[in-house]
Amino acid sequence: MYEREVQMTKKKIAFIPIDNRPVCYELAQDIAAIDGDIELLLPPKWLLGDLKKNSRIDGIYSWVESLNEVDYLVVSLDTIAYGGLIPSRRSSETLTEIKNRVEKFIDLFKSKNAKILAVSSIMRISNNNINEEEKEYWSKYGKKIFKYSWDLSKDGEAQTDVPSEIIEDYILTRKRNFEINCCYIEYAQSGIFDTLVLSKDDCAEFGLNIQECRKFEAIIKEKELKNVLLKTGADE
């Protein structure tokens, strides 16, 4: 009787984080290191964004292009669509521009024949006048926009003295991000994404983000999508 030597092949997981913070980058490495059967592949840290700069999307595309024989692609969709979590709130790009970029990545992902596990954030609305992670006008109108969002969600109407062009910009940004997330749900429904997580960040009892969550819940229920999940927390 001959003893057969079984060689274990490590599962290769390519991970595109939401940005380069330790909780998104080093912590992922620490978690993967717990299981000796996992090989975690990450883009160079300098390609990823932070509080002050966007991710280098073209560089991340080239990195994915260079990958060979990966089993799983774990992807922050905010990174490939906007350049990160903060740019997803600040970006002035159109829905068409974002969709075209995402579709280019999707074609690349499909060519890797790997399971795709994707995460996208539902745009938050913070109750403060701090624009460090928001558009410039948040420093003056942040709390008022929060109240406008709260009242509109709670009562179906709202009054505000925030300039109409700022309200319009905010609503259009939310609508664009909502539509992109709807596209992601379609990718999950068609099987392109094996799993899609839509993450809720800094939620209050009422708000336009809460309305969007309810719409997503209704879509998921109507389409009976077991592979689309709504979870709390964007960084996690």
Question: Which stretches of residues belong to each language-model region?
Answer:
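An N-terminal assembly and electron-transfer interface module characteristic of large anaerobic redox
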Residues: 2-236
